Amino acid sequence: MGTHVIKMPDIGEGIAQVELVEWFVKVGDIIAEDQVVADVMTDKATVEIPSPVSGKVLALGGQPGEVMAVGSELIRIEVEGSGNHVDVPQAKPAEVPAAPVAAKPEPQKDVKPAAYQASASHEAAPIVPRQPGDKPLASPAVRKRALDAGIELRYVHGSGPAGRILHEDLDAFMSKPQSAAGQTPNGYARRTDSEQVPVIGLRRKIAQRMQDAKRRVAHFSYVEEIDVTALEALRQQLNSKHGDSRGKLTLLPFLVRALVVALRDFPQINATYDDEAQIITRHGAVHVGIATQGDNGLMVPVLRHAEAGSLWANAGEISRLANAARNNKASREELSGSTITLTSLGALGGIVSTPVVNTPEVAIVGVNRMVERPVVIDGQIVVRKMMNLSSSFDHRVVDGMDAALFIQAVRGLLEQPACLFVE
């Protein structure tokens, strides 16, 4: 028997260090050749690290959230043969970019990063019984299941490493009678528990980007009320006539079309700003970022060349991109290169929002909830479908008057939807 050492691979693009996001193995596990053992994250992508050999895991070289240098020891594996071989595997890009975007972090007790974790006997980590008052270890998914089921995790025995509670442990607990499980009845009682969640992986990248955007960009926001009664009637008519054959239309492809048409007269808004080089790049192509909330956080897949797509073509591509982002299947290319971003919370859109500019872009258009409201038209009170657009701009590049005129142009197109299709 011998020892096979895998080192952190060179991801490319001149990257000297990466963040260890998640382990898929633990000390004592038997793994196969090409099995993915960990996810690591660069500034641009989450990358899967496969094992080039099969064997038994002896030691792990870091904790999730730890930043590791390229070439540092990642994992030790006991293998058949002489061993003593140091290997740098080929990293496999995962279909999840890093920013705005990776694996969901798991809560950890205050663990100091170690050179590596190893068992003296090279056996699997033992189950450590929880002492009264200790915070139970469990992944966010397990905690959510327990919360939804009204179960306090301190009553659940964990069979994972260091007493971590697994889905199987929760299933076993839920299969027991309530009295046998020792579950206390729900009531009005004081809670003293708290949870510390490490900011790692995707959440760290989102935090960094949001902080950077708010610190560097001179944000200003503009809100406009829009009567979308005619637009909604057109959308429903098109869906009724063509929905079965072409797919149902949401409001998003109409909003994209309105941006494309309006941007023809406002090239300074379809732009990116390099504030270090002091260069504004005005783009002919309209690449619309579609802000999408997934289980792992916010991602912005990009609808490329929206100016060249028909209403249904753009609708289909928006749907495909959003599904890919939600399922962590979007490629790195599909999540980069936007020139303006559209963000919508749908039915949760609220009345007003102040979205954060997706740098290096200079504008983001936010869509709020559509509601029926009484409005005055020609001296008469009528019920109309109304919706607000809440948009933010980089005031270093976009003047307030230009921003207002741009949103007014979008408003005119949405209120008179026939104009969307007049060249």
From Swiss-Prot:
GO (cellular component) term, any one: cytoplasm
EC number: 2.3.1.168
Domain Peripheral subunit-binding (PSBD) residues, every copy: 137-174
Keywords: Acyltransferase, Glycolysis, Lipoyl, Transferase
Keyword Transferase in annotation: yes
UniProt cross-references to InterPro entries, sorted A to Z: 2-oxoA_DH_lipoyl-BS (IPR003016), 2-oxoacid_DH_actylTfrase (IPR001078), 2-oxoacid_DH_E2_comp (IPR050743), Biotin_lipoyl (IPR000089), CAT-like_dom_sf (IPR023213), E3-bd_dom_sf (IPR036625), PSBD (IPR004167), Single_hybrid_motif (IPR011053)
Family annotation (PANTHER family): DIHYDROLIPOAMIDE ACETYLTRANSFERASE COMPONENT OF PYRUVATE DEHYDROGENASE COMPLEX, LIPOAMIDE ACYLTRANSFERASE COMPONENT OF BRANCHED-CHAIN ALPHA-KETO ACID DEHYDROGENASE COMPLEX, MITOCHONDRIAL
Oligomeric and partner information: Forms a 24-polypeptide structural core with octahedral symmetry.
Family label: Belongs to the 2-oxoacid dehydrogenase family.
Protein name: Lipoamide acyltransferase component of branched-chain alpha-keto acid dehydrogenase complex
Organism: Pseudomonas putida (Arthrobacter siderocapsulatus)
